[in-house]
Amino acid sequence: MPLEIVTVPCLSDNYAYLIHDADAGKTALVDAPEAAPIQSELDRRGWSLDQVWLTHHHWDHVDGLAALRDRYKPTVIGAEADAHRLPPLDLAVSEGDRFDLGGAPVEVLDVSGHTVGHIAFHLPTGKAVFTADSLMALGCGRLFEGTPDQMWASLSKLAALPDDTLVCSGHEYTQSNARFALSVDPDNAALKTRAAEIDQARAEGRPTVPSLLSLEKSTNPFLRAADPGIQSLLGMQGADPARVFAEIRARKDHF
């Protein structure tokens, strides 16, 4: 039976994710913005909580962990590089490490940029990657700690995953990201179609995530810094993609 992935809205615009392996009867949580909606979803489905995967240290991704830990006693997994500023970890992991959720392997990717020590969790058999505030729907996280070179390397790593991978990001920023993307790439037909679909989804109260990696690669300007068309629109033909990415990120910061 395939893994079940459930998007859980938290706080004002955060998302947590529950991953359930029905064959093994095991459930993991990606990030813990607040406990109440996560507990409610677990109760509604009759699931316990076996693992919590933390992507980075920001409060809006960890604030609900203490209550969840008290109730469920899960194994808490996070980045070894971030262990000094994360809640106490039961398992500290780094780039290239693997662990299992029931029968499903989980691969750890270093995606530093938004923070130094940010990690993503890739489920190759579940065809999903949990990116939090690194790669986002039509965007990427602001560079609070890392450099443009680091974030471009992280995004390039994520873009190399299979096209049918679901990108499970950490916030509902997609409408504003779409407006910015159209300012950078106004003639992209796929982007215009996607922006209209996003507006419709939000009007109906539906999440715009997860998104498909193939769609991100064709519409997300932060993944397209090496694209000659984007470079031409920015007046940066032939420039190093990391420099082009830095320019796109700077424009977004002031958009």
Swiss-Prot record:
Which family does the entry's similarity section mention?
A: Belongs to the metallo-beta-lactamase superfamily. Glyoxalase II family.
Q: Which CDD domains match?
A: hydroxyacylglutathione_hydrolase_MBL-fold (cd07723)
What remark does the entry make about the cofactor?
Answer: Binds 2 Zn(2+) ions per subunit.
Q: What reaction does this catalyse?
A: an S-(2-hydroxyacyl)glutathione + H2O = a 2-hydroxy carboxylate + glutathione + H(+)
Q: What does this protein do?
A: Thiolesterase that catalyzes the hydrolysis of S-D-lactoyl-glutathione to form glutathione and D-lactic acid.
Cofactor(s) required for function per UniProt:
Zn(2+)
Pfam family of the protein (one)? Lactamase_B
Designated name of the protein:
Hydroxyacylglutathione hydrolase
Instruction: Describe its assembly.
Output: Monomer.
Q: Give the signal peptide as a residue range, or say none if absent.
A: none
Instruction: Give me the residues that bind Zn(2+) 2, please.
Output: 60-61, 133, 171
Q: Which organism is it from?
A: Ruegeria pomeroyi (strain ATCC 700808 / DSM 15171 / DSS-3)
Q: Which residues bind Zn(2+) 1?
A: 56, 58, 114, 133
Pathway, per UniProt? Secondary metabolite metabolism; methylglyoxal degradation; (R)-lactate from methylglyoxal: step 2/2
Q: Which InterPro entries match?
A: Clx_II_MBL, Glyoxalase_II_hydrolase, HAGH_C, Hydroxyacylglutathione_Hdrlase, Metallo-B-lactamas, RibonucZ/Hydroxyglut_hydro
